[in-house]
């Protein structure tokens, strides 16, 4: 698996754009939906993640491929907003997926630290 670069990966490009919407980067909540989400407490974007996840579940339950794609895109977008808030990047998530690649789900779960 290759590591995507900011120049050729859509997730990286979106993350770059989202970073410009952060309040400390001058993002204007009056003119940007993302800046508005990021200027509020995390509950604002966390609520959207929950809503989009529920909509994805409903689309999948109904077996509607176009809606599944659309709702997945909405969910991923709001997850990218959350990553931006916490100063994380999609590459961090992709690296974790790469680390897990080839492991059985049970093996991967057993390797996780216990809380």
From Swiss-Prot:
Record pathway: Amino-acid biosynthesis; L-histidine biosynthesis; L-histidine from 5-phospho-alpha-D-ribose 1-diphosphate: step 2/9
Keywords: Amino-acid biosynthesis, ATP-binding, Cytoplasm, Histidine biosynthesis, Hydrolase, Nucleotide-binding
UniProt GO MF annotations: ATP binding; phosphoribosyl-ATP diphosphatase activity
Main localization of the protein described in the UniProt heading: cytoplasm
Catalytic activity of the protein: 1-(5-phospho-beta-D-ribosyl)-ATP + H2O = 1-(5-phospho-beta-D-ribosyl)-5'-AMP + diphosphate + H(+)
EC number: 3.6.1.31
Record-linked SUPFAM superfamilies: all-alpha NTP pyrophosphatases (SSF101386)
Cellular compartment(s): Cytoplasm
Statement: the UniProt record of this protein carries the keyword Methyltransferase: no
Highest taxon, organism lineage: Bacteria
Pfam families listed in its UniProt record: PRA-PH
A single cellular component GO annotation: cytoplasm
One record GO biological process: L-histidine biosynthetic process
Recorded family membership: Belongs to the PRA-PH family.
Name assigned to this protein: Phosphoribosyl-ATP pyrophosphatase
Lineage of producing organism: Bacteria, Pseudomonadati, Pseudomonadota, Betaproteobacteria, Burkholderiales
């Amino acid at each position: 698996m290759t590591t995507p670069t900011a120049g050729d990966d859509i997730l990286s490009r979106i993350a770059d754009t989202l970073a410009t919407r952060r309040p400390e980067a001058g993002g204007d909540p009056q003119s940007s939906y993302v800046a508005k989400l990021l200027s509020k407490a995390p509950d604002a974007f966390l609520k959207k993640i929950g809503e989009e996840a529920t909509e994805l579940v409903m689309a999948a339950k109904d077996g509607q491929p176009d809606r599944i794609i659309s709702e997945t895109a909405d969910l991923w977008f709001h997850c990218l907003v959350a990553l931006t808030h916490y100063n994380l990047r999609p590459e961090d998530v992709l690296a974790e997926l790469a680390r897990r690649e080839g492991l059985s789900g049970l093996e991967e779960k057993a390797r996780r630290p216990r809380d």
